[in-house]
Amino acid sequence: MAALPVPLPPTKMAAVEKRRPAVAPAANFPDSGRTSVSQAAAAAESEEDFLRQLGVTEMLRAALLKVLEIRPEEPIAFLAHYFENMGLRSPTNGGAGEPPGQLLLQQQRLGRALWHLRLAHHSQRTAFNNNVSVAYECLSASGRKKKPGLDGRTYSELLKRVCRDGGAPEEVVAPLLRKIQCRDHEAVPLGIFRTGMLSCFVLLEFVARAGALFQLLEDPGQAVADRRVGQAVLDTLEGALSAGDMATAPTHYLEAGSRLGPDNLARALDRAASGRRPSVPMAREEFLEKAAALFIAKVKPVG
């Protein structure tokens, strides 16, 4: 017969009960936990949806991609300028925030397109082409009184803005504009738009290099160069450009001009200096016009 357990005294029973861990009611903890988690998830989802609906998420993503694409020396200043220009009316927001004047809207479109075109140097081929496409979309967007697409009038106005802001004399760039402009009501496809913008930017750099070259030739006291020397340099430059006749891109002519080495230039200067008769001077404007004409002659006209 097994021995029965001896019951504990009341005082020991009370001590054992005190040592048992207290258990929270099962009905309270799970409900409060689920409520707090669900509220946090709902708040996070609501904030994310809010940013997505405003376009902030996509805007930040586009800004960071642009920094990676261009790799500016001062990324913070670049981003500040980027977001400042984002304040202009976006071409995809369907007319929201459209200014009262159609002319003002057109100027905003041109300013926005011009800003995109300047983000990357034309030598950064991929980044430049991407920015050209964005600029084309800015100008091609439809509005309340504008059909989608880019017309020749807007395209020609942007070409003039690029050249004017580039600092080149009007008489120097005018022959190029006459070759690549379109008629006012003519539809301008992206390919022509890209070639026209690239031609303008390359010409501006070409003229800047020609100006630096003229500084080496000119008499500091008179700000003119000997005509024989200037013409000899232009003839040598023309020969360097002729080597790029098989190239189709305007940048190839710029590269050909940069191959105007010191040896060829020195020989041209020696030949010019060997003449004994006095020569009339050549002004800077004339030299730049003739140098630009060498490049413009290689550009194919539109149409």
Swiss-Prot record:
GO terms for molecular function: microtubule binding; tubulin binding; tubulin-glutamic acid ligase activity. CDD domains: DD_TPGS1. Keywords: Cell projection, Cilium, Cytoplasm, Cytoskeleton, Developmental protein, Differentiation, Flagellum, Microtubule, Phosphoprotein, Spermatogenesis. Its main location: cytoplasm. Pfam families: TPGS1_C. It comes from the Eukaryota. It is found in: Cytoplasm, Cytoskeleton, Cilium axoneme; Cytoplasm, Cytoskeleton, Flagellum axoneme; Cytoplasm, Cytoskeleton, Cilium basal body; Cytoplasm, Cytoskeleton, Flagellum basal body. One of its GO terms (biological process) is adult behavior. Broadly expressed at low levels. Highly expressed in brain. Present in brain neurons (at protein level). Disruption phenotype: Male mice are sterile due to defects in the development of the spermatid flagellum. They have reduced body fat content and fail to attack each other when caged together with other males. GO terms for cellular component: axon; centrosome; cytosol; dendrite; membrane; microtubule; motile cilium; synapse. InterPro entries: DD_TPGS1, TPGS1. Subunit of the tubulin polyglutamylase complex (TPGC). The complex mediates cilia and flagella polyglutamylation which is essential for their biogenesis and motility. May act in the targeting of the tubulin polyglutamylase complex. Required for the development of the spermatid flagellum. Part of the neuronal tubulin polyglutamylase complex which contains TPGS1, TPGS2, TTLL1, LRRC49 and NICN1. Interacts with PCM1, CSTPP1 and LRRC49. This is Tubulin polyglutamylase complex subunit 1. The gene is Tpgs1.
